[in-house]
Amino acid sequence: MNYEARPDASDSAQCAAGMSDKVAANPLDSDFIAEMTRIFRNAWVPVCHESELPEPYDFRTTSIGNENVIICRAPDGKINALLNVCPHRGMLIERRPQGSFLEGQASGNPKRITCMFHAWQFDMRGNCVYVAREKEGYQERFSKDDAGLRRLRCTVNYGGFVWVNMNDQPVSMLEEWAGPAFGHVEQQLNSVHLEVVHYHKEYVEHGYMTEALEFLSAAKHGSLFDFGHCAINANGDN
């Protein structure tokens, strides 16, 4: 199927008003950087549901924009969001999609988040608790207190969903950011017990029917709780 997109008068008007007429594909593209900065670094993003972390030391990994994030439950039951990057050499720490730190990793101790590069270890709040050869290699020039994982703004609300904001000083808190539009949704979400019971991934060989499936199928846009809203990607990812 060949289709040539031709800009019409409305497209020209939008471009004239300052809207870009191209898709940002290069990570260094100014539009892409603006999107990461103005949207993903300032919005409250739902990353998972609290039921996915039922026990202390349970974790999930995800990404917000182009940043890798660990969501984990601390021993006191609090859910924390941490940047999934070691402050030592910028290594991606946890590559598994989910699991538990209770038993420890191959290169670390139980109940620790461990970077496999140099075995630096962190607790569930992101505090650095172990540095290999700390005294021999750093003497008094270094303190673990200054080497923790970056903690992100994190809260649980609206039916138990975990929301994260990449901005250390958010422009607004979640409730203010959500605004009146969330009033009806909040009532629905909080009126029933929500729990993630399994994960489902669906591969689509071709994406030519994506638009019809996404906008016309009753199963996609029925009751919020009767049907699951599945994201469909033209590349066949979901």
Give the ranges of each region predicted by the language model.
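Residues at helix-coil transition
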Residues: 40-41, 88, 216-217
